[in-house]
C-alpha cells in the first residue's frame, strides 16, 4: 500500500484559496441539470464525488462542458425530471452526495435505473430514504441487502404526505426536498427524530432558492412543497470554498501558527462547518472573520466538552486537534460518524490510540486525553479522505506521522498534502 510520511512541522503560515465545497458542488450540478436554461458553475470541486455525479448526469443525457482544470462547468438543464434513454446502471463510487439525491430525483416519472457503488457504499444505510420515497408512490427494489444499495428505481414518485427519519443522515431530507417541487402533487414532509447536521439542510434550501424554488419550513419539523414547479437557472453560480476542507488549515494555524488564512468562505458562507472556527476560538485560538475569509492565529489550546451534531464532518478535525490541547476533550452527539465513508468513531478511536492518546469510544461520543509525547505510527485511513487529512496534523508535533493510502483525499481535496507542505516550515 502506498504511504506518505510527514516529517515534523515547526510552523504553518500563509493563505489558501479553498477548493469548491463538495456539498454545494453536487447539489448545484443536480439542480442545474433539472433546471430550465443554461448554468455556468465556477469554482466547482474537482474530486471523485463530483466526477461520479457528472458521469451519472452524462449517462442521463445531460449536456455539459468542463474547463481544462474541471472547475468551471457549463451545463444545459433538462427543464424537468431526468429521463434515462433505456434501462441504465449508474456506478456512484462512495459518493453519498450523489447516491442519495439521485435516488430521489430518478424516482420522478418512469425510469428503470440501477444505482450501485463501491463495497463501502453497499454498507451505508439508505432504508429511511427508500421508505419515504415509497410513501410518495416510488417503486424501488433492493437488489442485495435490505435497506442498502444497490437499488432498482422504477419511477412513480408523485408527492403527498411523507415522513422521513432525520436521525441518521440529513442527506435523506435533502434528497426529498430537491425532488418534491418536480412531483405532480404537493408534498408535506414530516421529520421524525432529531434532525442531524441541520446546517446541511440550510445549504439545500439556499440552493433551491437560488434556482427559483422556495418552500415552507416549519421549524425543521415539517416542510411543505408545492408540486408541479420548475427550477430556473440563475445564469452564473459561484461555488463557495469547502468549509470542511478549511478545518485542517485553520486547526494547523491554531496549533502551529503564525496565522493561517483560508479564502473562499467567510461570515456570509451558507455552510454550517464555518462554525468550526468558533470551536477553535473556544479552545484558545484567535479567529478573524471577513466576508470571504477566516484567519486563525495560534493560541494556547485547552480541552473542550461539546455537542458536535451541527458540524459532524469538521468535528473530526477537533479530535486530532485535541492531541495538542491541555486536558481531556469530549465530542458528543456524533453517532452519524458511524454511517459516513467509514465508521468514523471506531476509526478515529483506533488511530488516536496508535499515536498514544487515551481514548474512550462511546455509542455517540468520543473522549480524548493526549499523551505527554505523541508516538510515530502508520495511520490507517479506511478509504476515508477526512481520516487522512485529520491525522496529517500529528506532524505539527515533534513526531513524524505516516499516512497510509494518502491518495484517498481525492474524494474532496486531491492536492491537500501539497498545499499543507507549501504553508509549512519543517522542524
Curated annotation (Swiss-Prot):
Primary location: cytoplasm
GO process terms (BP): amino acid biosynthetic process; aromatic amino acid family biosynthetic process; chorismate biosynthetic process
Quaternary context: Monomer.
Record-annotated active site: 313 (proton acceptor)
Taxonomic superkingdom: Bacteria
Enzyme class label: transferase
Catalyzed reactions: 3-phosphoshikimate + phosphoenolpyruvate = 5-O-(1-carboxyvinyl)-3-phosphoshikimate + phosphate
Protein EC: 2.5.1.19
GO molecular function, one term: 3-phosphoshikimate 1-carboxyvinyltransferase activity
Organism field: Salmonella schwarzengrund (strain CVM19633)
Assigned keywords, A-Z: Amino-acid biosynthesis, Aromatic amino acid biosynthesis, Cytoplasm, Transferase
Binding-site list for phosphoenolpyruvate: 22, 96, 124, 171, 344, 386, 411
Matching Pfam families: EPSP_synthase
Annotated family: Belongs to the EPSP synthase family.
GO cellular component: cytoplasm
Keyword Glycosyltransferase on entry: no
Amino-acid positions noted as binding 3-phosphoshikimate in the UniProt annotation, renumbered to this chain: 22-23, 27, 169-171, 197, 313, 336, 340
SUPFAM superfamilies, alphabetized: EPT/RTPC-like
Gene designation: aroA
NCBIfam families named in the record: aroA
Protein name: 3-phosphoshikimate 1-carboxyvinyltransferase
Location in the cell: Cytoplasm
